[in-house]
């Protein structure tokens, strides 16, 4: 007697049947049992490693932590990048940076008030190719702990760079370990004297990044560079409830 589908049990009841006093099982159920046993073996091998790993703590991505993100766009600029070279993105002490930043692209008012504490600071870089249908990747190099008196070169040669993310966006954490940012009147300093805002307010407590950007193209490319500072702030709860009306 051959295999007859009518003699087989329903899929909802099981995957085995008895034909001519022989216990038969589908090949799919056999493969499923093998896979299940392999998963049990892998779990048994992983359990001792997991017990040891649970004794240690690791830090999560601080960008995804608690707090509110406040983004300030410093400038947007189109620059031409030569092949096999990298261009300095931002010269923090240059007059061109101050003029371009504060006269054209900067926000009129600083969005962080005095009752908010800065928890973290990020340097955000967004790159966009200006010509369509260009097949190349963006490369990047940066330094954080540079000497304040160091004069950065505008153009350097590419040497072991790394690729910018798939969305052509990169964030660099500028926090210094062991230094807490004090509560200061940031809004008034920013609006009254923006030229000293970086040197006197930010850089004593955060790293001043030197960021270089390049491409993998063999031709001269025009790139739109958008530079922004992203503040992660912690808002304090008000001292009195914000209720209005005759009952209060």
From Swiss-Prot:
Q: Which InterPro entries match?
A: Polyhedrin
The question of whether Secreted is a record keyword is answered with no
Q: Which GO terms describe its molecular function?
A: structural molecule activity
Q: Is Zinc tagged as a keyword?
A: no
The UniProt keyword set, sorted, is: Viral occlusion body
Q: Which Pfam families match?
A: Polyhedrin
What is the superkingdom listed in this entry's lineage?
Answer: Viruses
A single Gene Ontology CC annotation of this entry is:
viral occlusion body
Similarity field: Belongs to the polyhedrin family.
Q: What does this protein do?
A: Component of the virus occlusion bodies, which are large proteinaceous structures, that protect the virus from the outside environment for extended periods until they are ingested by insect larvae.
Q: What is this protein called?
A: Granulin
Native source species: Trichoplusia ni granulosis virus (TnGV)
